[in-house]
């Protein structure tokens, strides 16, 4: 897959009504022919909900303040091409649309927490390098606490992960702040590194709900 397959970057739309930095009242998501596909607008400090996006974009309404689309590399003076399901749509560039590489976006904001009951095999195959070599496949089993992983890198269809040292987490029910996550990340560096295939072409192999936002309770 090449760099413009639409999964190498993430475009995040923000909702803010704070003074001069307030976001636009509307983000117009358009079809390739320029016709309107969806008007995403502010509704009482939240972005509007619509079934046209449900299950079709990477981040949809986890807090109502931002949505995130996989997108192509943006080009100056041109609309941003974003994925909605298997289709391409466009968004006009805005200071309130943040573009990150997929790797940076996932490393900064998310952990990978796979589903599974205690004693069950985790859903993906794990490898020591970004290559599906059957002879080197590693099977991991869910433990009593529930395994979680830091996302260390993304290379195309492969994601580099490392187990979270939950003993290093603060004993609190409050939101874990960035500085605290940095300490946990450092403590976790002694844990094994694995590679998993997070997508295959257009098919995402990880349930979106298994990408867990770091800064929520």
Predicted region positions:
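Active-site environment of non-heme Fe oxygenases that use a 2-His-1-carboxylate facial triad
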Residues: 130
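Non-cytosolic beta-sheet module surface loops
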Residues: 151-153
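Boundary regions of SH3-family modules and the immediately adjacent low-complexity/disordered segments
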Residues: 1-35, 49-120, 133-136, 156, ...
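Short N-terminal secondary-structure initiator segments
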Residues: 43-49
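Loop/turn positions that initiate beta-strands
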Residues: 143-149
């Amino acid at each position: 897959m090449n760099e413009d397959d639409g999964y190498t970057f993430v475009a995040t739309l923000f909702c803010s009504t704070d003074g001069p930095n307030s976001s636009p009242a509307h983000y117009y998501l358009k079809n390739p022919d320029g016709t309107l596909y969806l008007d995403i607008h502010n509704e009482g400090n939240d972005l509007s909900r619509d079934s046209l996006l449900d299950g079709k974009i990477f981040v949809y309404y986890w807090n109502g303040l931002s949505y995130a689309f996989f997108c192509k590399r943006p080009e100056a003076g041109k609309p941003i091409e974003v994925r909605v399901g298997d289709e391409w749509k466009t968004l006009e560039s805005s200071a309130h649309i943040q573009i990150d590489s997929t790797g940076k976006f996932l490393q900064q904001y998310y952990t990978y927490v796979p589903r599974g009951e205690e004693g069950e095999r985790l859903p993906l195959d794990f490898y020591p390098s970004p290559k599906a070599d059957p002879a080197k496949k590693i099977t991991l089993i869910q433990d009593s606490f529930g395994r979680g992983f830091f996302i260390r890198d993304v290379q195309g269809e492969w994601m580099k992960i490392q187990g979270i040292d939950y003993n290093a987490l603060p004993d609190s029910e409050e939101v874990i702040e960035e500085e605290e996550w940095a300490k946990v990340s450092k403590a976790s560096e002694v844990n094994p590194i694995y590679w998993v295939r997070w997508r295959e072409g257009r098919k995402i192999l990880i349930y979106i709900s298994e990408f867990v936002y770091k800064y929520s309770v």
